[in-house]
Regions:
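Active-site-adjacent structural elements that line small-molecule/cofactor binding pockets in enzymes
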Residues: 1-293
Length: 293
């Protein structure tokens, strides 16, 4: 099992001194990944349902905070203040940025870090942010995400790539240097829904669900294993070996205070260190290869 630590992009720790301390301490302690989330703007009025809370409310909206650091900038800064730890976008809202810009930026970072970049990808959930940024239609975000990822893979792996999609078109372009990692930086597909799982099978190297989505609960080992079985079934249907897909898990609700699950038992990853270590072991036994906290 590999472990990643989320870096703050907002709040009292979102400053150079504290992020530096957290990042370098995580590297010393043996963490495998530093992760950075993605918002470019935070509208002051949000009616879109946030997928990772029971009531659909976006927690950043409490108190009217709109603070957030930009993902690619912070990722680049982290690359410069660490030596060996891998870096993960967790996740990039893929429609937020031009795919060729993302491909070039991440390939450059992979070169400069000698292969430490991991590209976490999501389709996004906040309609208001899409509208503020002037992006392709929010309702087409799944198609846009799939096409952008495919285009990025093309420029990472082909000498003079051509792409003719609905949202991306280019012809025999040059995009060098290529990433250090062969064939490209690992692509982690975030999301718990069936479209996200299909995206993983078609385009991803790692499936990266968040355990706190109430529509697709994975806050017990049983529900997590059921979704993994569904993913493996989709892989079989597509002719892809399930073992070729890594399994990651974002654990957003860990705490040393034991909490009660809705079924009356203990919520996983809460409680004593021994209890949480046993939870981790059980997830590892189920095939999980990476956990982000």
């Amino acid at each position: 099992m590999k472990f990643g630590l989320s870096m703050p992009i907002r709040g009292p720790l979102a400053n150079a001194a504290d992020i530096l301390t957290l990042a370098q301490k995580a590297e010393v302690l043996g963490y495998d990944y530093l992760t950075v989330a993605d918002h470019i703007v935070v509208p002051t009025e949000i009616s879109s349902d946030y997928p990772y809370s029971e009531d659909g409310q976006f927690p950043w909206s409490e108190g009217g905070s709109v603070e957030c650091m930009e993902q690619f900038t912070l990722l680049s800064w982290l690359a410069g203040v660490t030596d060996k730890i891998a870096l993960l976008t967790s996740v990039t809202v893929v429609p937020h940025r031009n795919p060729l810009f993302m491909a070039k930026s991440l390939a450059t970072l992979d070169q400069l870090t000698k292969g430490r970049i991991n590209f976490g990808c999501g389709a996004g959930w906040m309609r208001e942010e899409f509208e503020a940024l002037g992006l392709p239609p929010f309702d087409a975000r799944g198609k846009v995400t799939n096409e952008y990822i495919a285009a990025i893979k093309a420029v990472w792996t082909e000498t003079r790539p051509t792409f003719d999609g609905e949202f991306v078109k280019f012809n025999k372009i040059g995009m060098d240097p290529k990433p250090v990692q062969n064939p490209h930086p690992p692509i982690w597909i975030g999301g718990e829904s069936l479209p996200a799982m299909r995206r993983t099978v078609a385009l991803g190297d790692v499936w990266y669900p968040f355990g706190s989505n109430p529509k697709f609960r994975m806050d017990t080992l049983k529900t997590y294993k059921a979704r993994v079985e569904r993913l493996h079934g989709l892989a079989d249907e597509a002719g892809r070996g399930p073992a070729s897909i890594g399994l990651a898990y974002n654990c957003a609700f860990h705490t040393d205070q034991e909490q009660e699950h809705m079924d009356g038992g203990r919520l996983i990853f809460t409680g004593s260190p021994e209890q949480r270590a046993e939870d981790i072991k059980r997830f590892a036994d189920a095939g999980t290869t990476s956990m982000i906290i």
